[in-house]
């Protein structure tokens, strides 16, 4: 059995078309959804991510402002810019690209963003809302993963979901989202004693560690759904995920590829969050 692919590019195109339609409806009312992207320093990967986010906004009817500052920018100066964006009525979402230079406290900066403009879903108010099941902005990557499961009509009720990774950006919010859909959730991490024993019980596996081949074919039960959040490079320098794709695709029922899986969905859900922020006006 070869797994069916969950195509993140195709699903993104569908969702972005809907974003563009809703953005046009807002513009007809005199509201252009606006995203401010703040980049500090010259991290090459961050520059690529930021360009992709800005382009996605422009391609789908959203207004995007890129503020690029030198790495020497002080924490106080960055906080002042965030406060100014909080008070800008043309901006509905604020994204501060991580990582930040070492002299800037990323937590302090994220907490300075107004919760109503926290379209990355990283603010403690967003995390708390997710925890207790209240409306709020969901972090874009796990939100995209949930949309992928939804796209295949997968009913999570009563299913065992294993999340590999416990980051605040993916692992923890992913577990909460799965729990909201009535899955039984296990979170695995670097101190988990027998990862294979856990994953072999799983109906759904989300790999979000940032380490190649953390999930191999012998760790997956036949027919399981495998979501690969990882972004790594193999020995040839090619993009790969956390999952041994070639092996696991022969066992799993569904699998997401890297590239072309979760990656495009992350940016798409950023657009959705920004749009929904503007629609609340």
From Swiss-Prot:
Q: Where is the signal peptide?
A: none
Name the residues that bind NADP(+). 165-167, 190
Its annotated pathway reads: One-carbon metabolism; tetrahydrofolate interconversion
**GO CC aspect terms:** cytosol
Give the UniProt keywords, A-Z.
Amino-acid biosynthesis, Histidine biosynthesis, Hydrolase, Methionine biosynthesis, Multifunctional enzyme, NADP, One-carbon metabolism, Oxidoreductase, Purine biosynthesis
Q: Which Pfam families match?
A: THF_DHG_CYH, THF_DHG_CYH_C
Stated EC number for the protein is 1.5.1.5, 3.5.4.9
* Functional summary from the UniProt entry: Catalyzes the oxidation of 5,10-methylenetetrahydrofolate to 5,10-methenyltetrahydrofolate and then the hydrolysis of 5,10-methenyltetrahydrofolate to 10-formyltetrahydrofolate.
* Name this protein carries in UniProt: Bifunctional protein FolD
Lineage, highest ranks first: Bacteria, Pseudomonadati, Pseudomonadota, Betaproteobacteria, Burkholderiales
């Amino acid at each position: 059995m070869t797994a069916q692919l969950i195509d993140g590019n195709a699903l993104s195109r569908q969702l972005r078309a809907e974003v563009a339609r809703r953005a046009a409806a807002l513009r007809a009312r005199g509201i252009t959804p606006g995203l401010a992207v703040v980049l500090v320093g010259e991290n090459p990967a961050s520059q690529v991510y930021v360009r992709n986010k800005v382009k996605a906004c422009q391609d789908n009817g959203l207004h995007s402002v890129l503020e690029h500052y030198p790495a020497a920018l002080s924490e106080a100066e960055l906080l002042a810019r965030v406060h100014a964006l909080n008070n800008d009525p043309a901006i509905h979402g604020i994204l501060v690209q991580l990582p930040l230079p070492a002299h800037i406290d990323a937590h302090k900066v994220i907490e300075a963003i107004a919760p109503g403009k926290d379209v990355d879903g990283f603010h403690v108010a967003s995390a708390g809302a997710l925890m207790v099941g209240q409306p709020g902005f969901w972090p874009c990557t796990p939100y995209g993963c949930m949309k992928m499961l939804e796209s295949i009509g997968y009913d999570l009720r009563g299913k065992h979901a294993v999340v590999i990774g416990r980051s605040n950006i993916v692992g923890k919010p992913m577990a909460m989202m799965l729990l909201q859909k009535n899955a039984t959730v296990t979170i695995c991490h670097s101190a988990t004693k027998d990862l294979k024993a856990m994953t072999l019980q799983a109906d759904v596996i989300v790999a979000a560690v940032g380490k190649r081949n953390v999930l191999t074919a012998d760790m997956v039960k036949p027919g399981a759904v495998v979501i690969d959040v990882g972004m790594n490079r193999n020995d040839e320098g090619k993009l790969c995920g956390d999952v041994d794709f070639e092996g696991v695709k022969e066992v799993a029922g569904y699998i997401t590829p890297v590239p072309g899986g979760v990656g495009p969905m992350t940016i798409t859900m950023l657009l959705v969050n920004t749009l929904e922020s503007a629609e609340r006006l």
